[in-house]
Amino acid sequence: MKLLALTFLALAALASARNINLEDVIDLEMITAYDYHNKIGIPLAEKIRKAEEEAELSSSRIVGGSSASLGQFPYQAGLIIEAPAGTGVCGGSLLNSRRVLTAAHCWHDGISQGRSMTVVLGSIRIFSGGIRMVTSNVAVHANWNALFITNDIAMITLPSAVSTSSNVGFIALPSGNELNNDFAGFTATASGFGRTRDGGAVSDTLNHVNLPVITNAVCRNTFITIQSSNVCTSGANARSTCQGDSGGPLVVTSNGRRILIGVTSFGHRDGCQRGFPAAFARVTSFISWINQRL
């Protein structure tokens, strides 16, 4: 209760300093991450499951977005989270044989916490195929704040080591000069098992989209509490991450290799095709935290 009171005091101070309504700050930051399991993860999981089952009986393709081929994103993890109210879905990134990076709100969304999760690797479908491991070993960032949606990062430890193959591989972390790069102007690739468009559409398979990385100053025009520890992508041309992609990777090519620069955190409550930016946890801001847990 004391922590909640302090959080609201901090929100009030921020609102006063920027001459905006407190309700506006809270409303912006409680968009797609706060209470994620009940609002998004659990309802979406059942729709994805049904889409996969129907795909087994039909040759229909995905409407909107681009489907991934098996092995195209070998570092992509699918997460099936068992929460108190039901089963939800998220994404993650395989860093080494026993560590998967995801968003904190995929495990604890400010209202409910997961009990266990199935980590799915080497599959373009989340409810079937691939390597599947059950774990509850999740380290959430100690300063994760579900109201501000800050420090939205968590590390999953797998119960046993996974072997690499053509379909399973690790994503590199930024290093050297890349640690000082904000990546604005880069074209990044986001991938996930979430919705392919607003209005209830889901896919039966992994999807991906290329997105321009924008400056935090531009992003802050939409999300006023964007921090330096966030990285954002443009939502122009109705292209963005969407509900269910939470925790998944944002990747760029640098020095001839793919590196992880973001963990999918939140988008705008009004939808994924309205031109609003998407926000991610900036990997370079958490590189020490990540390396300590590898």
Question: Model features per residue range: what roles?
Answer:
Residues 2-294:
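Extracellular "complement/coagulation-type" protease architecture
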